[in-house]
Each structure stands twice: as C-alpha cells, then as structure tokens.
Curated annotation (Swiss-Prot):
SUPFAM superfamilies: HD-domain/PDEase-like. Its EC number is 3.1.3.89. NCBIfam families: PRK03826.1. This is 5'-deoxynucleotidase Ent638_2835. Its cofactor is a divalent metal cation. A divalent metal cation binds at residues 33, 68-69, 137. HAMAP family: 5DNU (MF_01100). It comes from Enterobacter sp. (strain 638). GO terms for molecular function: 5'-deoxynucleotidase activity; metal ion binding; nucleotide binding. The keyword rRNA-binding does not apply.
C-alpha cells in the first residue's frame, strides 16, 4: 500500500492567509474560510429545500464547499485585484486551478480517487451546486468585511461595496433569506448576540 500526501497538503491550507494585500484586524486562513463556506453553503441548500421547494443535496453542497479552495494549497491565494485584473489573467488562472485540482486528485489512492475527484474537480458538479457554493463563498467574504468594519478597520470598505454588487448579481431567494435572518448579527457585539441566550 503506497503512501499519499493528499491530506498532508490539505493540512497546509491553514498556512495560507486570505486577503494578503489588506490590513486585517484578524487574519483569516483558507482552512477556516473553507469551513465557514461549507456551513453557509449547507444552510443555503437547506433553506432552498425547506422554504423554496428546492431539491438539492445539502450534504453534498457542504462537501463541495469544504473543498472549493483546496487547489490553493498548490497555487496560493491570489489577491482578487490580481486574479481579475483582466480577462486573460482570469482565464489563465482558471487553467492553473484546473491543473492544481487534477494534481490533488492524482494524489489520492486510486481506489478512492473518484470520490475525491467529484468534490475537488469543479467540472464534476452541476451548475446549481456550483452556484450555491459561489453564493456561499461571496457571502463569507462579505461577512469578513462586516467583521473587519465592525472592528473599526476601514480598509474593507471598498471590498464590502464590491461584494454587495457580487451578491446582488448572484441573488436568490435562499440568499435573501440568509441575508435577512443571519447576517445582521455579524455587526453586533458578543454581549448583544448573547442577550437572549443566557447559559
């Protein structure tokens, strides 16, 4: 039985900081971001199913979200202004991501490869699944902006404005629900969110 470096690589996602060109009150790494995106994507899928007659596999959505940035362990987290500087750079970076995704999949033992390929290779998910993960990814970036702004860091003002436009372009009923029900709390203090739930 041969050894695989797959999970040793994924473990290093915690060493890759997001928002590298911006001053952060608290740094965020790709590993913790992936967990938050998985939780939010799962919630969006559950909301879609329960409230808006959707029929998506919420658990699969959570897993897709958990692995959505896995290739960054090989590529690093390219800052958004660089990644989308022009269409040629965006296209080339997509090609690099695809190569990195395949390299990760190839690290998995052959008898398990199809399971992980279905989670890491973004071309193996449906458009509906992809959109839910993209919504969750943008929502989590937006929540990071709210947290930084609430801590007095105006460095995130323009990012918040840009992400509001992104969220508007990806708008859905489940996202509207999430924004109305869950997002306002991110601008409150610990005391404020704990008032109604004493231990």
């Amino acid at each position: 039985m041969s050894q695989s470096h797959f999970f040793a690589h994924l473990s290093r996602l915690k060493l890759i900081n997001r928002w590298p060109l911006m001053r952060n009150v608290r740094t965020e790494n790709v590993s913790e971001h992936s967990l938050q995106v998985a939780m939010v994507a799962h919630a969006l899928a559950a909301i879609k199913n329960r409230k808006f007659n959707g029929n998506v596999n919420a658990e699969r959505i959570a897993l897709l979200a958990m692995y959505h940035d896995a290739s960054e362990v090989l590529t690093g987290d390219l800052p958004t202004p660089v990644k989308y500087f022009n269409s040629q750079i965006a296209q080339e970076y997509k090609a690099i991501e695809k190569i990195a995704q395949q390299k990760l999949v190839d690290m998995v033992p052959e008898e398990l490869r199809d399971i992980f390929a279905a989670l890491i290779d973004e071309h193996q998910c449906s458009e509906e699944e992809r959109l839910l993960v993209k919504q969750a990814d943008a929502l989590c970036a937006y929540l990071k902006c709210l947290e930084e702004l609430s801590a007095g860091n105006n460095e995130f003002l323009l990012a918040k404005s840009r992400l509001e436009k992104t969220l508007e372009s990806r708008r859905s009923e489940e996202m509207d629900y999430f924004m109305q029900v869950f997002v306002p709390s991110f601008q409150l203090s610990l005391d404020e969110i704990s008032q109604d739930s004493p231990l």
